[in-house]
Amino acid sequence: MTKFVFVTGGVVSSIGKGIVAASLGRLLKSRNYTVSILKLDPYINVDPGTMSPYQHGEVFVTDDGAETDLDLGHYERFTDTNMSKLNNVTTGAIYQAVIHKERRGDYQGSTVQVIPHVTQEIKERIRRVARETNPDVVLVEVGGTVGDIESLPFLEAIRQFRKDVGRANVAYVHVTLVPLIKAAGEMKTKPTQHSVKELRSIGIQPDVLVCRCEQPLPRGIKEKISEFCDVPVECVIQAQDAPSIYDVPLVLEQEGLAQRVLEILNLDPQQPDLREWELLVQRLHHPQEQVEIAIVGKYVRLTDAYLSVAEALRHAGLALNAGVTLRWISSEEIEERGPEALLSGVDGVVVPGGFGNRGIEGKVASICYVRERGIPFLGLCLGMQCAVIDWGCHIAQLERANSYEFDPDTPHPVISLLPEQKDVEDLGGTLRLGLYPCRIMPNTLAAKLYGEAIIYERHRHRYEFNNAYRSLFLDSGYVISGVSPDNRLVEIIELPSHPFFIATQFHPEFRSRPNRPHPLFLGLIEAALRSRPQPRPLQLQKMG
């Protein structure tokens, strides 16, 4: 029977529940257990697709086209397992389903209430993950903080769940904070005690406490937490701040988290095989070379808006024994100061995705700058569209060339609305979403990087290259190196006269893994290394 581990958080938000859940997933997988991870988000949005990146961070897209919480990116990268729409559930989606059932008459005249109808729907979503993916263990991260009114239905549902499936089949892991009062030099356990008290008042007794801390927890502090929170001292897990998120699985393994959870679930605590992960962490902390990559974006005030892009760059650096330093640059600041002032000295540039016309001129100016100076460049989604606008304006001599999204009155809409989007009125869930095939043209940079004729990548867009300008762009030196199998949609463009200039309509960052870096990011970092004073031979690897 599938076992269930529920991960909750207390004291403060953003305490690291997602990384703890992802790390535990990695540790269980290293013991040959299959895992699936579900994120329960307490906001009333049906999904994060229409939320501001400044409020939510990145929207992570799965193969089946779900727009999900960025934690699903951590789950995929840490467990090397694809997630789906099953793995992210929001309050909005729960209430939408409950109201739909009520309108359909499923409740047969009952008064629809939080208990039992909403909690039953939540439990059904948890069971559905177990039923359809059939893992040994389902990890469930409950978003928000214990005490938040929005989280109460989820906490009540997971309280009931242990009774429904049996005590031996459920473990509760609570992530909390043990702050250090630096003026006094003391670590305080009261926030943890009150957080557990709040959780117990709901009816949940945590089995394991994962305590975030700046310094190692003394034995006496662990014993005090154990005494006041009614948790065995060996189940008080120290989670000291780590140099990187990729250190966390090793930190938690050293503390015995996976072993404690497996004992609670009556599963065999096998010996883990973490050799590959340990090698990754060793490479991360001891790079042989260093490169600096600029990310020119609209939302750089919150770098989590580009989380998968940043991680994909680091993955490529790991494979090449190179440390990757990121220079975050606002495209609006480039509009004010010019690209020379902000991009000078970088080894490569990424222009990632986004929506709306704010900061677009800065993105286009950045692309023009790297194109003219031979700086390695990778454009993603909107980044490709801006590269097309740059070429249309400056090389193809199309006056006021632009995207229809930014200027509906442009005489040259080199980027146009997808035909199937013309009658769409709703914003949420209506983009071209999910995994689609792409045919790679032979004898191109894309063909060299991928090493395959047909690839599959994840999309999230509403606009596309305007085929009315395809011949003009080809005649002026552009190469279209990737198209949809029916040749209708342009998916990859590149410049053969440039050392490394490639841009995609899709989002390759979503498929990069620490142990399997994406070939486009690998190519960018390798090109950045070659552009430095001591060039290195090409060491590209195919995606597995």
Curated annotation (Swiss-Prot):
CTP binds at S13, D148, I149, E150, K188, T189, K190, P191, T192, Q193, K224. Catalyzes the ATP-dependent amination of UTP to CTP with either L-glutamine or ammonia as the source of nitrogen. Regulates intracellular CTP levels through interactions with the four ribonucleotide triphosphates. It holds the Pfam family GATase. Residues 1-267 are annotated as: Amidoligase domain. The gene is pyrG. It comes from Synechococcus sp. (strain JA-2-3B'a(2-13)) (Cyanobacteria bacterium Yellowstone B-Prime). Pathway: Pyrimidine metabolism; CTP biosynthesis via de novo pathway; CTP from UDP: step 2/2. Its EC number is 6.3.4.2. It catalyses: UTP + L-glutamine + ATP + H2O = CTP + L-glutamate + ADP + phosphate + 2 H(+); L-glutamine + H2O = L-glutamate + NH4(+); UTP + NH4(+) + ATP = CTP + ADP + phosphate + 2 H(+). L-glutamine binds at Y54, G354, L382, G383, M384, Q385, E405, R462. Disulfide bonds: none annotated. This is CTP synthase. GO terms for cellular component: cytosol.
